[in-house]
Amino acid sequence: MVAVSLKMSQPAAPPPPMGERARTRMLLALQSRGIHDPRVLEVMGALPRHDFVDEALAGHAYGDATLPIGEGQTLSQPYTVARMSQALELGYGMHVLEIGTGSGYQTAVLAALCRRVYTVERIPSLALLARERLERMGITNVRYRVGDGTLGWPEPRPFERIIVTAGAPATPERLKRQLEIGGRMIIPEGGKLNQQLICIQRTGPESWQRDVLEACRFVPLVGQQGWE
């Protein structure tokens, strides 16, 4: 596999009992479902996913299931994280906007695969926990904001990649405008319970190409240009 730096200044906490075996099973399951980007597999195999959930759930961290993280939010199943990360087609020099920090796990995956992550979380308590968690791990190439993610990053700037980790009724216009020409966005669109995972590529100043990747299920994207 390709060597990937996780940009950690401190070693990760040791995995729980059976953790290494569970990680191996997780990676094999991801590969069997079409995850082939060696960088994504390397990063997800190295990250201590159990550190992103309550201790009581640590034994379930590497199973292919969503897990609660509080405030009615969830940590996406490993396949979903891997699928979205792979679909972004990340480069190490890229700046990535993430809407929905959540536990910080997806943020950590992105941080290992690009130059800098700009992440927005609307729930202050989750944003604080995620920031503390990532800083403890020594991940330093992330900028954090608390606010309405449907409005994008507060300072106007283009991003090569945008990832949205909650289901939107439609793609927020502000996010479309913050995607640079030639850039790519991965976003779940649809109803509150079921969505389609969409890849949006900006092809010109006023043109975007949309492709449906697969069915998915996310918590609702709440905000001015999302759900109430």
Curated annotation (Swiss-Prot):
The keyword Cytoplasm is assigned to this record: yes
Compartments in which it is found: Cytoplasm
Region Disordered, residue ranges: 1-20
Active site: 76
Top-tier EC class: transferase
Gene Ontology biological process terms, A to Z: methylation; protein modification process; protein repair
MF (Gene Ontology): protein-L-isoaspartate (D-aspartate) O-methyltransferase activity
Keywords, comma-separated and alphabetical: Cytoplasm, Methyltransferase, S-adenosyl-L-methionine, Transferase
InterPro entries on file: PCMT, SAM-dependent_MTases_sf
HAMAP family listed in its UniProt record: PIMT
Family (UniProt): Belongs to the methyltransferase superfamily. L-isoaspartyl/D-aspartyl protein methyltransferase family.
NCBIfam families with a match to the protein in the record: pimt, PRK00312.1
Protein task: Catalyzes the methyl esterification of L-isoaspartyl residues in peptides and proteins that result from spontaneous decomposition of normal L-aspartyl and L-asparaginyl residues. It plays a role in the repair and/or degradation of damaged proteins.
Protein name from the UniProt record: Protein-L-isoaspartate O-methyltransferase
Organism: Magnetococcus marinus (strain ATCC BAA-1437 / JCM 17883 / MC-1)
